[in-house]
């Protein structure tokens, strides 16, 4: 009886609690969440800076956008002093009609208030990208800013706030929290570097921060592509003897007219040296891939031949890009090879892709061969004994079904002998797998992949070995 009373009391308490939740007033239900005191203090500090800028320049002040990169928020919380606490807030403003309209303002939390503790400024209408990194080995992190001057024109700047005088509380003497008067001259960071750079057509930045010479210091690699195809190159800058200095340049492949994509990765070997994988567009629409690294004490393009043109050219088939195809964290470079065609397939091109990898000694090594079906989202690792033995065709005549047929090549005058079909069907058509005697490769959301061995040729694979070789194409390979 006592237990029943306890249970009844608990039920009553829960009912009363739920009543309090479910029968709140409409005003309470639709009320915006309360903002933290720190958020309000920061916004008040930003408003004061905007007001001071408007008074100083007699011009309108608005927010400035950040186009690309990992830091695109309008207000960015950062740990600039490297103590593990994000004590700084960075915001981006634009003042209309002045020489350097873009203003990047740094605030530091001092007690419960936010004080403005630094500013950098630049030309253009937008901040293309910004990064924060220790460049000069002391003080606060530097700001590495790519200013978008106009469409297709960019300036890369490196700025330090270390020359600003901070009080014991971490604030400058340029402004007090209760004042709208700001001496901006006391807030300006020092410009360590200002140079032009390219931006890739996929949106990736034409500059990369990395310890490219592996001396434990961060360097800045800047890519510049000449649209005339004559003089494209990479230049590396680093902090030496109290200043930013050019540490070396290296030419990129002749004939490139547009930067397509930049990836920072490694060369094979231990330790893995950093390398830039630079994909550019040629005047004829093909792609050239340059691999740039620090080798034997200097900046080197590992892919250039004696004529100054990259050995890694994608011509005719450009749907693949450098990819970590074998999962060892080092990018491989694709080389497409056109397969022979027969009959109705003469108008359709099918390719096998050889993947190679550059190591820390600059040597090029073959890793694997694949067939990539980009439209259907899968690829097949090709066994070595298939090389020079196969052709590929496609059959999309059945509604809701796509079939890729692998056949043994018997020569130009003989019809190829099919030995394997790989199917992509919708999940709603899953009954076709058993009805047709196929075997399942795998099932994804709304899609089933299946296969069937055909003919008499022993291709050297069983069902499980084929499953292990058919893999999904990761979209990040193409868009990261």
Give the role of each language-model region.
Residues 408-429:
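A short acidic-to-branched-hydrophobic micro-motif
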Residues 21-394, 398, 403-404, 429-432, ...:
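Beta-propeller-forming repeat regions
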Residues 444-463:
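Domain-scale activation on soluble regions of proteins
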């Amino acid at each position: 009886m006592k237990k029943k009373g306890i249970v009844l009391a608990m039920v009553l308490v829960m009912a009363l609690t739920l009543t309090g939740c479910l029968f709140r007033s409409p005003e309470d239900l639709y009320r915006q969440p309360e903002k933290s005191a720190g958020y309000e203090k920061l916004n008040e500090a930003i408003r004061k800076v905007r007001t001071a800028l408007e008074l100083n320049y007699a011009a309108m002040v608005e927010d400035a956008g950040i186009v690309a990169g990992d830091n695109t928020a309008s207000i960015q919380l950062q740990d600039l002093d490297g103590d593990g606490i994000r004590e700084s807030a960075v915001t981006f403003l634009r003042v209309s009609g002045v020489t350097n309209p873009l203003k990047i303002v740094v605030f530091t939390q001092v007690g419960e208030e936010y004080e403005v503790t630094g500013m950098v400024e630049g030309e253009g209408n937008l901040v293309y990208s910004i990064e924060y990194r220790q460049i000069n080995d002391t003080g606060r992190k530097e700001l590495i800013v790519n200013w978008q001057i106009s469409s297709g024109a960019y300036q890369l700047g490196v700025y330090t706030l270390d020359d600003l005088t901070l009080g014991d509380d971490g604030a400058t003497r340029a402004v007090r929290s209760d004042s709208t008067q700001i001496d901006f001259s006391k807030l300006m960071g020092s410009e360590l570097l200002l140079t032009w750079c390219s931006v890739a057509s996929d949106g990736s930045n034409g500059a990369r921060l990395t310890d490219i010479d592996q001396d434990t210091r961060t360097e800045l690699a800047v890519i510049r592509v000449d649209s005339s195809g004559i003089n494209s190159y990479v230049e590396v800058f680093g902090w030496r003897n109290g200043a930013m200095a050019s540490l070396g340049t290296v030419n990129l492949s002749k004939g490139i007219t547009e930067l397509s994509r930049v990836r920072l990765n490694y060369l094979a070997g231990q330790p893995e040296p950093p390398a830039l994988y630079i994909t550019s567009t040629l005047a004829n629409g093909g792609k050239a891939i340059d691999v740039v690294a620090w080798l034997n004490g200097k900046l080197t393009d590992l892919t250039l031949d004696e004529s100054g043109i990259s050995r890694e050219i994608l011509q005719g088939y450009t749907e693949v890009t450098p990819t970590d195809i074998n999962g060892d964290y080092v990018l491989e470079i694709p080389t497409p090879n056109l397969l022979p065609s027969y009959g109705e397939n003469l108008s359709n091109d099918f390719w096998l892709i050889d993947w190679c990898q550059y190591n820390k000694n600059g040597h090029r090594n073959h890793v694997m061969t694949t067939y990539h079906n980009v439209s259907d989202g899968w690829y097949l690792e090709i066994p070595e004994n298939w090389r020079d033995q196969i052709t590929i065709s496609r059959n999309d005549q059945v509604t809701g079904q796509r079939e890729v047929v692998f056949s043994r090549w018997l020569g130009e005058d003989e019809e190829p002998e099919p030995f394997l079909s790989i199917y992509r069907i919708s999940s709603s058509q899953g009954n076709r797998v058993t009805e047709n005697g196929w075997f399942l490769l795998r099932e994804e959301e709304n899609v089933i992949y299946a296969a069937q061995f055909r003919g008499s040729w022993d291709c050297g694979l069983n069902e499980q070995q084929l499953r292990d070789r058919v893999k999904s194409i990761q979209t990040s390979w193409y868009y990261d």
